[in-house]
């Protein structure tokens, strides 16, 4: 709201006094004390004036630079770009701040009288948005992607495969007999085990894949740029790592195993592939791994490893 009111006020004032008589406005304290940053630029990009809030953001805003083209002072500003809303990062030292800008065109007698940059520090707002976005896409218990989050990433990979030919693979993982952990030791133990599993998966993936909690004790792993054989190797490392893992819990030492189903995009040329199709294939491979004795890896269309 502040942006629109300020833009309206400034636009009316500048239209009233004309661009050449704008100093009549600047003599008033209100221009200087407004909390939003204000920077006035001529129609050909010459710095005319600014207020205190603008000067605290950009060190190059001082008297000796008035009359100079702003793109010489800071290449991020261009009145010819036609921008109306944009963000930039700035700050002093390691401190980085994010500013939201609005570029308002001011009317002169016969042509554009100039431009008014209005900007506001939105660092906290953007941090909150990022935090909310992270919370929406990540499981609150384990920190892995949520089901919706990991499927959104899968859609991106599938799009890259269809448009650019970038292969990827998908692993569906189920914790064997996980219910026994909850039944015998309680849900706190079960939650602890899930967190340890995610940590172990992440160490094996080492940034080369994405992990999501698909539901309960089921996980979905995406491995970009990996064909079936490489993905099966990753899956076996995941399985072996979990088999060797122990989790202290009170006076007890807990352990589990996992079953894994693996599928790769493009494994069956000529067939229409969607995320639902790939997940279904991985799930069928997982089902076969569980029916073959659990604690093993099955590749879709092949025998258990």
Where are these regions (language model features)?
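Conserved nucleotide-binding and Mg2+-coordinating catalytic segments in signaling enzymes
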Residues: 133-152, 173-187, 195
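Amphipathic HAMP/coiled-coil signal-transducing linker helices
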Residues: 28-30, 126-145, 159
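PAS-family sensory domains
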Residues: 111-121
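Catalytic-core segments of nucleotide cyclases and related cyclic-nucleotide turnover enzymes
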Residues: 129-130, 228-232, 250, 265-305
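A short pre-motif secondary-structure segment
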Residues: 210-213, 254
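Active-site-proximal alpha-helical element of nucleotidyl cyclase-like catalytic domains
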Residues: 189-210, 218, 237, 242
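Interfacial "cap-and-anchor" motif at the non-cytosolic start of specific transmembrane alpha-helices
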Residues: 1-34
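Active-site-proximal structural segments of metal-dependent nucleotidyl cyclase/transferase enzymes
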Residues: 151-185, 201, 212
